[in-house]
Amino acid sequence: MVSQAKQPSNATFKNREKPQEVRKANIIAARAVADAIRTSLGPKGMDKMIKTSRGDIIISNDGHTILKQMAILHPVAKMLVEVSGAQDVEAGDGTTSVVIMTGALLGAAEKLLNKGIHPTIIAESFQRAAERSVEILLNMSTKISLDDKEALVRAASTSLSSKIVSQHSSFLAPLAVDCVLSIASHDSTNVDLNDIRLIKKVGGTIDDTEMVNGVVLTQNAVKTAGGPTRIEKARIGLIQFQISPPKPDTENNIVVNDYRQMDKILKEERAYLLNICKKIKKAKCNVLLIQKSILRDAVNDLALHFLSKLGIMVVRDIERDEVEFLSKSLGCKPISDVELFTEDRLGSADVVEEVESDGSNIVTITGVKTTNKNPTVSVVIRGANNMVLDETERSLHDALCVIRCLVKERALIAGGGAPEIEVSYRLMKEARTMEGVEAFVWQEYAEALEVIPTTLAENAGLNSLNVVTELRLRHENGESNSGISVRRSGTSNTYEDHILQPVLVSTSAIRLASECVKSILRIDDITFSR
């Protein structure tokens, strides 16, 4: 009897264990990241202290800031950092919520995988549940107008309530609203936050933070040659060339034999500098902003002497990345060569002066006359030390982003976990009318959304089981705005308690979390390239 030829083994394709193990490892890694920042959610959330590789200390409870600084090695865990970053760009707030939600949805997916449901079916059902969730959120939101300043301030206050600076929210929230409204028009659908410049100065307290309608420079006016420190009806020039004698190449040397030649060099130098200064004065410029130079002195003492004699105020060492903002704000064009220094390239302002505030000097440019449609504002942030300043800047940025969200999508919803419980209740109700696997998946998705109110209650020291059960009951009775009020240490109508957030924060978080989970579930192997 002829022995049968041995068939090639198909076991490699039948190995179902590996994809399951990979998925399990991915879910564990992602959930570990979510659990790490879970304690920093909400007004009673804790802060994290981070020591960077350079030895700097950061204290923050902003989800994106914490994750960005964490040394994360697992590639799937890095996806959560990117999701947090995407939420920061899209909405500016809710960066912690989106990561916690992703972790909870992955936990739900793990339960479903253990029941033997295919990952693609889970991912697609999650996506459909997310779309339905967004519809529910938009239906329960309340439309607002940009004229309703009180509603805007309340939304900004809710964002600030979880930060270190929460006790200053009564002062910082209106400041954030004023900043955004001063650069946004009624028909605008977006706000470029680059038009709001945040400047940090150590000294004073957070209450000394102020908004300046105009431009603030951290550099001081040059006083060494007795130049002016206040100019009215200013004509401002922004230059990128140097007002100092040109240097020879490194290989070349100049040999001077006698003093007459030395005299000639000095005379030449004086004539060269005087010629530049006269051209600047001829263009009717009386305030000169000089960009920092690496090659040689941006402006030397002799040039400063000539400029002060001509009554021109000089501010030097303007950073390269400030040039674009200054030219946009002041309406002046950067000038790269003295031959191009003409009157039409200058900007105009009512007053440019150096003022002393809380022990340090700043230069303020107010009453800017520009043809630019988009005005700009500056905010000088004050604080006791750099850590406080950095966290105040991050908190203020979050508040500005919340107002920007309301310019994009002019609708508010209740905060304190109310929208998540409402969406969870509605999805659960709809899941009961479905058939097959989809019903299972929607139920798990709905349950996972309850992680936000559960975490809020845990962080506030409440009994999360009792609180969430009570909230479910209230929502079943039609109280769709019932959420957790930390001030009352229990449940209440958070909309009436003025705990508000833009609808865009919640819709964006649900969309991004569901997309991230979909990506993670579709991965069945990790290979490392050479």
Curated annotation (Swiss-Prot):
Positions in coiled-coil regions: none
Region (Disordered): 1-20
UniProt main location, coarse: cytoplasm
GO BP terms: chaperone mediated protein folding independent of cofactor
Subcellular location per the Swiss-Prot or TrEMBL entry: Cytoplasm
InterPro entries reported in the protein's UniProt record: Chap_CCT_delta, Chaperone_TCP-1, Chaperonin_TCP-1_CS, Cpn60/GroEL/TCP-1, GroEL-like_apical_dom_sf, GROEL-like_equatorial_sf, TCP-1-like_intermed_sf, TCP-1_chaperonin
Keyword GTP-binding (UniProt): no
Cysteines joined through disulfide linkages: none
PROSITE patterns named among the record's database cross-references: TCP1_1, TCP1_2, TCP1_3
Superkingdom in the source lineage: Eukaryota
Ranges of Polar residues composition bias in the record: 1-13
Keywords: ATP-binding, Chaperone, Cytoplasm, Nucleotide-binding
PANTHER family (alphabetical): CHAPERONIN
Subunit structure: Heterooligomeric complex of about 850 to 900 kDa that forms two stacked rings, 12 to 16 nm in diameter.
Protein name per the record: T-complex protein 1 subunit delta
Organism of derivation: Kluyveromyces lactis (strain ATCC 8585 / CBS 2359 / DSM 70799 / NBRC 1267 / NRRL Y-1140 / WM37)
Gene name as annotated: CCT4
